[in-house]
Protein backbone atom coordinates (compact mmCIF):
# COMPACT_ATOMS: atom_id res chain seq x y z
CA UNK A 1 0.00 0.00 0.00
CA UNK A 2 1.31 3.43 -0.93
CA UNK A 3 0.87 5.36 2.31
CA UNK A 4 1.89 8.59 0.63
CA UNK A 5 -1.52 8.70 -1.06
CA UNK A 6 -3.16 9.01 2.35
CA UNK A 7 -1.30 12.16 3.41
CA UNK A 8 -3.15 15.40 2.70
CA UNK A 9 -0.99 18.40 1.79
CA UNK A 10 -2.28 21.80 2.93
CA UNK A 11 -0.54 24.88 1.51
CA UNK A 12 0.16 27.95 3.65
CA UNK A 13 -0.60 26.24 6.97
CA UNK A 14 0.15 27.12 9.74
CA UNK A 15 1.65 30.13 7.97
CA UNK A 16 2.27 31.33 4.44
CA UNK A 17 4.99 29.38 2.64
CA UNK A 18 4.56 26.18 4.68
CA UNK A 19 3.16 23.04 3.03
CA UNK A 20 1.61 21.10 5.92
CA UNK A 21 1.60 17.29 5.70
CA UNK A 22 -1.62 16.19 7.41
CA UNK A 23 -1.74 12.68 8.92
CA UNK A 24 -5.44 12.84 9.83
CA UNK A 25 -6.35 11.47 6.41
CA UNK A 26 -4.01 8.52 7.03
CA UNK A 27 -5.29 7.62 10.48
CA UNK A 28 -8.97 7.96 9.53
CA UNK A 29 -8.54 5.09 7.06
CA UNK A 30 -8.35 1.91 9.15
CA UNK A 31 -6.45 -0.07 6.51
CA UNK A 32 -3.89 2.68 5.93
CA UNK A 33 -3.48 3.16 9.68
CA UNK A 34 -3.04 -0.58 10.21
CA UNK A 35 -0.48 -0.73 7.40
CA UNK A 36 1.39 2.22 8.93
CA UNK A 37 1.58 0.47 12.30
CA UNK A 38 2.67 -2.78 10.63
CA UNK A 39 5.44 -0.97 8.73
CA UNK A 40 6.67 0.72 11.91
CA UNK A 41 6.68 -2.65 13.68
CA UNK A 42 8.66 -4.19 10.81
CA UNK A 43 11.22 -1.36 10.88
CA UNK A 44 11.48 -1.62 14.68
CA UNK A 45 12.88 -5.15 14.36
CA UNK A 46 16.33 -3.75 13.53
CA UNK A 47 16.50 -1.98 16.91
CA UNK A 48 17.19 -3.41 20.36
CA UNK A 49 14.98 -1.52 22.82
CA UNK A 50 13.16 -1.85 26.16
CA UNK A 51 10.70 1.02 25.82
CA UNK A 52 9.02 3.20 23.22
CA UNK A 53 8.79 6.98 23.52
CA UNK A 54 6.86 9.48 21.45
CA UNK A 55 6.79 13.23 21.15
CA UNK A 56 3.55 15.10 21.87
CA UNK A 57 1.08 14.85 20.34
CA UNK A 58 0.81 13.19 16.93
CA UNK A 59 3.64 10.80 17.74
CA UNK A 60 1.42 9.36 20.48
CA UNK A 61 -1.04 8.08 17.86
CA UNK A 62 1.52 5.78 16.26
CA UNK A 63 3.78 4.95 19.19
CA UNK A 64 1.00 3.87 21.54
CA UNK A 65 -0.36 1.43 18.93
CA UNK A 66 3.13 0.01 18.32
CA UNK A 67 3.77 -0.18 22.06
CA UNK A 68 0.56 -2.15 22.55
CA UNK A 69 1.31 -4.52 19.66
CA UNK A 70 4.88 -5.18 20.83
CA UNK A 71 3.99 -5.29 24.54
CA UNK A 72 6.59 -2.62 25.33
CA UNK A 73 6.15 0.21 27.85
CA UNK A 74 5.18 3.58 26.37
CA UNK A 75 6.71 6.89 27.48
CA UNK A 76 5.22 10.29 26.72
CA UNK A 77 7.58 13.16 25.95
CA UNK A 78 5.39 16.17 26.61
CA UNK A 79 5.36 19.92 26.37
CA UNK A 80 6.40 21.91 29.42
CA UNK A 81 4.13 21.70 32.48
CA UNK A 82 1.94 18.89 31.10
CA UNK A 83 3.31 16.12 33.32
CA UNK A 84 2.26 16.08 36.99
CA UNK A 85 5.30 14.47 38.69
CA UNK A 86 9.00 15.41 38.79
CA UNK A 87 10.45 15.81 35.31
CA UNK A 88 13.62 16.18 33.31
CA UNK A 89 13.42 19.06 30.80
CA UNK A 90 15.21 20.00 27.60
CA UNK A 91 14.86 23.38 25.86
CA UNK A 92 15.23 23.59 22.09
CA UNK A 93 14.82 25.96 19.18
CA UNK A 94 11.80 25.89 16.90
CA UNK A 95 11.32 27.64 13.60
CA UNK A 96 9.13 30.21 15.41
CA UNK A 97 10.87 30.41 18.79
CA UNK A 98 11.78 28.17 21.72
CA UNK A 99 10.08 25.17 23.27
CA UNK A 100 10.62 22.68 26.08
CA UNK A 101 9.87 18.97 26.29
CA UNK A 102 9.77 16.94 29.45
CA UNK A 103 9.64 13.36 30.69
CA UNK A 104 8.85 12.00 34.14
CA UNK A 105 12.07 11.27 36.02
CA UNK A 106 10.84 7.75 36.82
CA UNK A 107 9.93 6.83 33.21
CA UNK A 108 13.34 5.53 32.17
CA UNK A 109 15.68 3.42 34.27
CA UNK A 110 19.45 3.67 33.91
CA UNK A 111 20.67 1.72 30.90
CA UNK A 112 17.28 1.23 29.27
CA UNK A 113 17.20 1.55 25.50
CA UNK A 114 14.39 3.64 24.05
CA UNK A 115 12.98 3.69 20.51
CA UNK A 116 11.58 7.12 19.63
CA UNK A 117 8.62 7.24 17.24
CA UNK A 118 7.11 10.40 15.77
CA UNK A 119 4.78 11.33 12.95
CA UNK A 120 7.17 13.63 11.10
CA UNK A 121 10.72 14.92 11.01
CA UNK A 122 11.59 18.28 9.47
CA UNK A 123 14.77 19.98 10.72
CA UNK A 124 15.32 17.46 13.51
CA UNK A 125 15.33 19.95 16.39
CA UNK A 126 12.52 18.29 18.33
CA UNK A 127 13.93 14.81 17.71
CA UNK A 128 17.37 15.90 18.90
CA UNK A 129 15.78 17.36 22.05
CA UNK A 130 13.96 14.05 22.60
CA UNK A 131 17.28 12.19 22.38
CA UNK A 132 18.84 14.59 24.90
CA UNK A 133 15.89 13.96 27.22
CA UNK A 134 16.36 10.18 27.02
CA UNK A 135 20.10 10.57 27.71
CA UNK A 136 19.44 12.99 30.59
CA UNK A 137 17.22 10.26 32.06
CA UNK A 138 20.23 7.86 31.97
CA UNK A 139 18.73 5.86 29.12
CA UNK A 140 20.03 5.45 25.60
CA UNK A 141 18.37 6.02 22.25
CA UNK A 142 18.00 2.80 20.25
CA UNK A 143 16.93 4.78 17.19
CA UNK A 144 14.16 6.79 15.59
CA UNK A 145 11.24 5.86 13.35
CA UNK A 146 9.27 8.62 11.61
CA UNK A 147 6.16 8.17 9.52
CA UNK A 148 7.07 11.17 7.33
CA UNK A 149 10.52 12.54 6.50
CA UNK A 150 10.67 16.01 4.94
CA UNK A 151 13.95 15.05 3.30
CA UNK A 152 15.10 18.43 2.01
CA UNK A 153 14.97 19.88 5.54
CA UNK A 154 17.69 17.37 6.49
CA UNK A 155 16.43 16.34 9.93
CA UNK A 156 17.27 12.66 9.37
CA UNK A 157 20.72 13.63 8.13
CA UNK A 158 21.25 15.67 11.31
CA UNK A 159 20.34 12.71 13.54
CA UNK A 160 22.54 10.33 11.54
CA UNK A 161 25.49 12.74 11.90
CA UNK A 162 24.86 12.68 15.65
CA UNK A 163 25.25 8.90 15.55
CA UNK A 164 21.62 7.80 15.65
CA UNK A 165 19.96 5.19 13.46
CA UNK A 166 16.90 6.53 11.65
CA UNK A 167 14.07 4.91 9.70
CA UNK A 168 11.07 6.46 8.01
CA UNK A 169 8.07 5.30 6.00
CA UNK A 170 7.29 8.19 3.63
CA UNK A 171 9.51 10.83 2.01
CA UNK A 172 8.17 14.25 1.03
CA UNK A 173 9.90 17.50 0.13
CA UNK A 174 9.54 20.07 2.88
CA UNK A 175 8.16 22.82 0.67
Residue ranges, per PLM feature:
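PRPP-associated nucleotide enzymes
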Residues: 1-175
Amino acid sequence: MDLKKFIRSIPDYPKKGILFRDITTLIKDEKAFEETINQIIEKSKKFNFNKIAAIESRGFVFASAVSFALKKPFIMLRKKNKLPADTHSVDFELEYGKATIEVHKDSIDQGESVLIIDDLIATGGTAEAAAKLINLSKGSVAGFIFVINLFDLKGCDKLIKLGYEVENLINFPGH
